[in-house]
C-alpha cells in the first residue's frame, strides 16, 4: 500500500502570520513537523502542500519535498485535493493529512492511523486520532476540539464544547481530537464534492461534513498529546517540551 503524507501549510494567519516558518529551537516549525513525520514507519513519501514561495524555499533548504497548490483553494481539503491530483496518486493510495502546526507530533501517532486502514479495510472512510484530556483548562476551551465515539471506536461527534456532558458527575474521561487524518485518494475526491454541512458550518469543523453525509470516521486513541501552535505564546511551550523530548 502506497502511503503519502501531506502537510498543508499556509503563510497567512490572522492570529499568527508566517506561523509555519516561526523558529522553534533554531528551526522553522514546518521542519520540526516534517522531520518528526519522517520517523514514522510505513510512509512512501512526504510532501509539504503550500501556495507560498517562502515556505517552499524553507522546506527545500532542509531537503524536504514540496507540492505547490492553488492560492485560491477555498479550504484545507481543496488544497489536499489539488496536491494529490498533481502527484498523480491512485484511487486506492492512502493519504495521511498532518497539520503543519504540530511540531510535537509523535511518529507512533502517524503509524496508528495507517494501521487502522491495514487492519480494517473497507470498514470506514476516514481515520483520525484522539487523546484523553489531562489539562482542565482544555475542557471548556473551544480551540481544543472534543470528540465522542462508540464502542467500536467510530466517531459519533466532534465539538468545540465539552462532550459528553456529565449531568451528575465530572469524574469521567473527555477526549480531544488531534489534527491528523487518513483516507484514500478516492474518498477525498468524494469528500471535496459534498455540500457544506449544517453542523460543520456551526462548529467550523470540516470533519463533521463526513459524519453528516453518513461516512464513518474510525478513531485510534493516542498515548501522546500533540498540541497545535495557534499563537506566538504556544512557541515557548513547544520549545520547553522539545528540550526534554
Swiss-Prot record:
GO cellular component terms given for this protein: cytosol
CDD domains: CMP-KDO-Synthetase (cd02517)
Highest taxon of the lineage: Bacteria
Top EC category: transferase
Sorted UniProt keywords: Cytoplasm, Lipopolysaccharide biosynthesis, Nucleotidyltransferase, Transferase
Chief localisation class: cytoplasm
SUPFAM superfamilies: Nucleotide-diphospho-sugar transferases
Any one Gene Ontology molecular-function term assigned to this protein's record: 3-deoxy-manno-octulosonate cytidylyltransferase activity
Catalytic activity: 8-amino-3,8-dideoxy-alpha-D-manno-octulosonate + CTP = CMP-8-amino-3,8-dideoxy-alpha-D-manno-oct-2-ulosonate + diphosphate
The protein's Enzyme Commission number: 2.7.7.90
A Pfam family recorded for this sequence: CTP_transf_3
Family: Belongs to the KdsB family.
Function: Activates KDO8N (a required 8-carbon sugar) for incorporation into bacterial lipopolysaccharide in the Shewanella genus.
Protein name (record): 8-amino-3,8-dideoxy-manno-octulosonate cytidylyltransferase
Species of origin: Shewanella woodyi (strain ATCC 51908 / MS32)
